[in-house]
Design a protein with these regions (language model features):
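Non-transmembrane, aqueous-exposed alpha-helical and coiled segments at domain scale
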Residues: 1-191, 196-281
Length: 281
């Protein structure tokens, strides 16, 4: 049975999500930050982690953005195949929600209309939107504002199959080491392995939205996530890049089938302000 959803409802939810995600960190991230502060071995590192927690508290209480970089708006939109939209074009409705959220929420407008000419759009649109069709009659929207301090430190490696699992590990560790303090650690490391050039990048981006306390359902991948987190935290980059035992809070890896001649690996790094909001309509 077809279910009709008014796109005005999409716009309203998008607006609220833009404001919510930029002022409040998800519970799993807050818990991870507290745990990191308790376990950090460096006194300076511990002090920095406590300051970051204080920043989160002030942001929520005073409705000030957690970070001045309120990001480029990234959405994953899962649309039930039994959904019919009425109103304006869905993509316009999403961008209108971003426009309203970033304007009414007094969030920084960080998007330029052309990558070379660099004129600001003044409303943080257009958003980056990834659509997928799923069974059912609901729409699930995941919003992830992505700051570019960490985005600029992200990498894609087109490995050869012969590079194998060791090549994958080395690629991930290389990306984190190269990022160093520039990604505002402690980091959240999203990894995509497989697919094609663009698919592995989307896998890595989606990995950043997975809750910190959830590992991959594939046993060997879950083991790899734990192993890499341990190795990354032995690099000594630490909170704020000033040394310590907490360089990353989590490593999330998504995989996908790939071509017999390829082994694509994407590493999408996020800072400690790994913001996201999810709503189902």
């Amino acid at each position: 049975m077809i279910r009709t959803i008014q796109t005005a409802e999409i716009t309203r939810n998008i607006k609220e999500m833009c404001i919510e995600a930029n002022h409040f960190l998800a519970e799993d991230m807050e818990h991870a930050m507290k745990k990191a502060a308790e376990e950090e071995k460096s006194e300076l590192g511990k002090k920095i982690l406590l300051q970051l927690q204080e920043n989160l508290k002030i942001a929520g209480e005073e409705m000030i953005p957690i970070c001045q970089d309120t990001g480029m708006a990234v959405f994953f939109v899962e649309i039930g195949q039994d959904v019919h939209f009425e109103g304006q074009w869905l993509e316009d409705a999403i961008n209108e929600g971003v426009r309203q959220g970033y304007t009414e929420g007094y969030l920084r407008k960080s998007v330029v209309a052309d990558p070379i000419l660099r004129e600001n759009t003044k409303d943080n649109t257009p958003a980056i939107i990834h659509y997928s069709i799923v069974p059912g009659d609901k729409v699930t929207i995941t919003f992830a504002p992505k700051g570019f301090g960490s985005e600029n430190m992200s990498r894609i490696f087109m490995l050869k199959p012969a590079d194998g699992i060791d090549g994958v590990k080395n690629a991930i560790l290389t990306a984190v080491k190269d990022a160093g303090p520039n990604a505002c650690p402690p980091m959240v490391v999203g990894v995509g392995v497989g697919g094609t050039f663009e698919k592995c990048a989307i896998l890595a981006k989606k990995a950043l939205t997975r809750p910190v306390n959830e590992h991959s359902e594939i046993p060997y991948v879950a083991d790899l996530e734990k192993e890499l987190l341990e190795k990354i935290n032995k690099l000594g980059i630490g909170p704020g890049g000033l040394g310590g035992t907490t360089t990353a809070l989590v490593v999330n890896i998504n995989t996908y089938p790939t071509h017999i001649a390829g082994l694509p690996v994407a590493v999408n790094i996020c800072c400690h302000v790994n913001r996201h909001a999810v709503r189902t309509i």
